[in-house]
Amino acid sequence: MAHRLAPAAEAGLEDIWYYIAKESQSFEIADRVVDSITDRFFLLANHPHIGRRRDEDLRPGLRSFPVGEYVIIYRVEDDGVLILYVVRGSRDIEALFRP
């Protein structure tokens, strides 16, 4: 199976990279963190049901998968997984889905 990134997921990865690069003053550290997250996209594409179901607290059909301090929010689709968001685990994830 394949994976695709929604615009919000792409923006989240960029935000994570810039934040880590600024705080650590190291592009290498930022690259490693983002690479560790994007590596999980391939895992999720091959094992799409590995993540925690979030039907009750977020929306039906959504799943989440932790990667260190971050959480990948995704949906399983017929042709793979759609990565919707990549956010810090401490963030109010439910707020992303409130009207």
What is the predicted function of each stretch?
Residues T38:
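Σ70-family region 2.3-2.4 aromatic/basic alpha-helix that recognizes the −10 promoter
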Residues A6-A8, Y19, H47, V86-G89:
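Generic beta-structure capping elements
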Residues M1-D35:
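Arg/Lys-rich, positively charged N-terminal/basic patches that mediate binding to nucleic acids
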Residues F41-I50:
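Short, solvent-exposed helix-to-loop capping segments enriched in aromatics
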Residues V67-V71, R75-P99:
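Enriched for short, Lys/Arg-rich terminal
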Residues I29, R52-R54, A95:
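Short, hydrophobic secondary-structure boundary micro-motifs
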